Amino acid sequence: MLSCYRNCKHFGVCGGCSSPQMEYASSLKTKELALHNLFAPLIPSQNILPVIPCSPLLRGRNKMEFSFYQTVDGEKTLGFISPSKPKKGIPITECLMIDERAMDILNITRSWWTAHPDLSAYYPPLNKGSLCTITVRVGNISNDFMIILTTSGREEFAVPLNIIQEWQQSLLDSGLPITSIFWEEKLSARNSPTTFRTTHLYGAPFLKQQLSIDGRSSLFHIRPRSFFQPQSLQAEKIIQTIKEFIDPCGEETLLDLYCGAGIIGILLAPYVKKIIGVELVPDAVASAQENIQLNSVDMEVFLEDAKQFCKRNENLPSPDIVVIDPPRCGMQNRALKYLLRMAPKKIVYVSCNPLTQIQECSVLVEQGYQLRRMQPIDQFPHTNHLENIVLLERLS
């Protein structure tokens, strides 16, 4: 059923959903048509598979971040920051995209903030203020929570540990199924990358997620900064599509660029001969290695930039298949150049940003690849965004 019974009370102001929840079918068709028009120069329409709708339409998000906000007059809100100008803090009391108990977590945090009026909201342009965000992650096995409070790491805005522990205890007293609580301190300095100092306050150091394809289930430990697809059921459909696109016979070598916590490679490992993962983020590599061991999978992971890995291995035997699932900015030119020198037979490109994806697919097509098939999957209902998976094959 491609509709919802009502719209969220914050629709139109919070900056989250850009189309009414009650009009999902029409908004999905609009997104699909836009994607067809965008990729028309590269692929015949009949090779674009029908978009896979999001399921469930409501309460399916496994992660959401909420922001602390404060006006110059001192009015405080916890929720979303509107995209309007001037920006406004929207005190979210309902969100149809995530488990409704997330609102209990926000309400507990609001009460704690009210009890400590000296704590100010963080203001990124000036790197001032104490409270940044609260992130709620939901496990799909026990519907339990990981909660991450992010505050400023600047000494003059630091939040004392005993105040943090008050917040922690309020959450634990609520009776909510909380698996783990983390406190992150954001360390920002001009002309330097932002880093985080993490304190594990309570419970397990990870949240459990389970994904299955072809009846095979794999368990994943997701840590505070692990990337995981935002809709667990849609993630299974993404990986199932990748498997169908590569059509493995069991003798292939598969290179998983931007492998993150190893999820794609681990789920595809039973179908190919060898899996190699490449990831730049140390925390993600640690998670990947943990998940590889957890699932008894033979997969090698390199802590390396994708460009450097491709450059270092450009003269070695080419992998049969390369799966790339890069950030929204894409692979970028130099990484793409070295990937082309590796000349894999098949490339599966997964992207949440089709504008970047088509630019890089155009380069691949110019250099001897053909875009064979395309499968859009909706992970972001009621927004303008689509996940898109394309299969490119090297012309002989």
UniProtKB/Swiss-Prot annotation:
SUPFAM superfamilies: S-adenosyl-L-methionine-dependent methyltransferases
EC number(s) stated in the UniProt entry for this protein: 2.1.1.-
Source domain of life: Bacteria
Keyword Manganese among record annotations: no
Keyword Metal-binding: yes
Residues of the active site: C352
Annotated positions binding S-adenosyl-L-methionine: Q229, Y258, E279, D325
Major enzyme class: transferase
Keywords: 4Fe-4S, Iron, Iron-sulfur, Metal-binding, Methyltransferase, S-adenosyl-L-methionine, Transferase
GO biological process, one term: rRNA base methylation
One Pfam match: tRNA_U5-meth_tr
GO terms for MF: 4 iron, 4 sulfur cluster binding; metal ion binding; rRNA (uridine-C5-)-methyltransferase activity
Gene3D superfamilies: 2.40.50.1070, Vaccinia Virus protein VP39 (3.40.50.150)
PROSITE patterns: SAM_MT_RNA_M5U, TRMA_1, TRMA_2
InterPro entries in alphabetical order: MeTrfase_TrmA_AS, MeTrfase_TrmA_CS, SAM-dependent_MTases_sf, U5_MeTrfase_fam
Residues that bind [4Fe-4S] cluster: C8, C14, C17, C95
Protein family (similarity comment): Belongs to the class I-like SAM-binding methyltransferase superfamily. RNA M5U methyltransferase family.
The name this protein goes by in its record: Uncharacterized RNA methyltransferase CT_742
Lineage per the UniProt record: Bacteria, Pseudomonadati, Chlamydiota, Chlamydiia, Chlamydiales
